[in-house]
C-alpha cells in the first residue's frame, strides 16, 4: 500500500500555479526524490503533503487515511498527520540538548518509553557521546543527525526531507547521504527527499520524480530517468546531454554520426538526438570533430567538439592525451538505444 498518495493536487498563488494536477505515490519503505530547479514547485508540494500549506484542489492520503479532500473540506493539521520532517536549516531548539531535542516528539509516551527510544536513536545516529550537548556545540553533520533522529522518534511511516544537505560542506554531503539512506532503510521508513542536486537524487532514491513549473515531468527509477528520459527537459536537466539534429525515416534515425534504430513512438521528421558525454569516444577512422574548448577537471579533461553540421558534443578524456583548440579528433558515438525528441525550442532545452 502507498504510504503517500497524492491525487490531482493543485496549488495557486494568485495567478501563479505552483503545483499543477499532481499525482504521486510513495510506497512503503521507499525513498522518492523530488528533483527540480529552483522555483519548480518541489518544496511547495512537500509542504502540501506535510500540512504546512493548503491545496486549492485534490486529495492527499497518508498511510491510507485521507488528510486532505478539498472538495469536501477535509483538512488534517500537520501535527496530526503522522509524518516526520527534516528542514533545510534543521530547526533544532537551541536551548535544548541533543537528547531533549530528540525527546521533543515523544511527549505522549511514558518516561521509560522515551528513554528507551532516545537511547535507540542515539545509537542508530552515532550520537551516544553527544547526549548533553547543545546544537551550537555540534558540527553540521551532527546537527543533521539530531534533526533526523527527532523526526524518526515517533516512528512515522514517512519522513519528509527539505533539501537537508544544502548546509553541509561539499566533502561531507556524500557521506551524510549514505548515512541517512542507510538509517531510513534500516528502519523501513519511507521518505520524500526534495533536492535540486541530481547526484543526490540519483544516488539516494529508489525512484525520482522530476518536476518543472509545478508539473511532474517523469517518475521512474534513477536508471530510467537518466537513460530513458521522456522529455527534452528531463534529458537535459538530469546528467549532461548534448543534442544533435537527426531525421526519422521509417525505422531509422539518420544523423551525421550514423544511422540508428528509431524508437517506435517517434513520428517521421526532424528530431534532436540526445548524446550523453560518456557515449562519445575518440576512435581512428571516425567522423572528424574540431576541438572548440577544453576544461581540465583533474582526473579528466572535458572537450567540447564541433561536428561538421555545427552541432556540438562533449567528450570526457581520461587518457593523458592533450588536444589543443582547433585540433581535429576522429570520434565515434555509441548509442545502445536512441533517445530523441521532436525539434524543440531553446527554452525547452534549457535547464
Residue ranges: model-predicted function:
Residues 25, 61, 330-332:
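ABC ATPase nucleotide-binding domain
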Residues 82-84, 88, 92-233:
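ABC ATPase nucleotide-binding domains
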